[in-house]
Amino acid sequence: PTWKRVFSARVFRDSKRFQTSYEDRVVKVLREYSDMPDKDVMTNEQILKAYGIISYTQTLECKGTVLCRTDTGQTFDTGDFPYGAVLNSQTMEHAKPVNIAKIRRIMTIENKANYENMSYKEDTLYIYCHGFFSPKEVEFLRELTVLAAENVEFLHWGDMDYGGIRIFLFNKDKIFPGLKPYKMDCESFVAAVTLNAGRTLEAEKRKKLEQMNAGELEELRSSILEYGMEIEQEMLV
């Protein structure tokens, strides 16, 4: 992988030229011809990341007690930061989780406001999802599945829309096989619509929802189509 600004400096002799003048056009082409199943809901950064161009903003945010060890043998505990720990890409590259003995629940949360609203609990690990996890994040987080005791609960709380369903399915398939949806059922959806927290479903998203296999979230998919509405987590804060 190459840092975005290093790539730009090497190609254009200007570290910001790629981002300001070419990034959107390059991503448009990559998105159009890519065979990645989630390309339509991936951000520019995620598309570029898949092709080896990375930015400095690749970080993993979490709240909870995870003991990690670097490849030089040093250890650190994310539990020392009860208001949230932030691991940059190089930390994820050179460290991995080695102990989560206190954790009984692991929850990925799609949106920042909802993540920030969750208070530290010694037996719970909250992970800010931000969308689709990068390959580096996926590799790092998979270690949690290996370390987790049999009674650890894996949950995902995300938007009740096309993208939210895709993110849940991605996390379940790529990271946490035992993942279950949290507050993403039909009852939660109807309650949110009743509170006027929904927004109108776009025609293009309706087509995609009609064609998708939503797995465990089939009832949610059907409800979105029935009501013609979708819900973002932030509307429920």
Spans of features found by a protein language model:
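Short, conserved loop/helix-junction motifs that constitute active-site signature segments
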Residues: V146-A149, I175
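Acidic beta-strand-to-loop metal/phosphate-binding motif
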Residues: N151-D161
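Generic beta-sheet signal
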Residues: C129, W157, Y182-M184
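A structural signal for isolated positions on well-ordered beta-strands in alpha/beta enzyme cores
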Residues: I106, L125, E153-L155, K180-P181
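Nucleic-acid enzyme cleavage-core boundary/entry regions
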Residues: P1-Y128, F133-L147, G163, F170, ...
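Long, hydrophilic "mature protein body" segments
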Residues: F154, F176-L179, T194, E202-E204
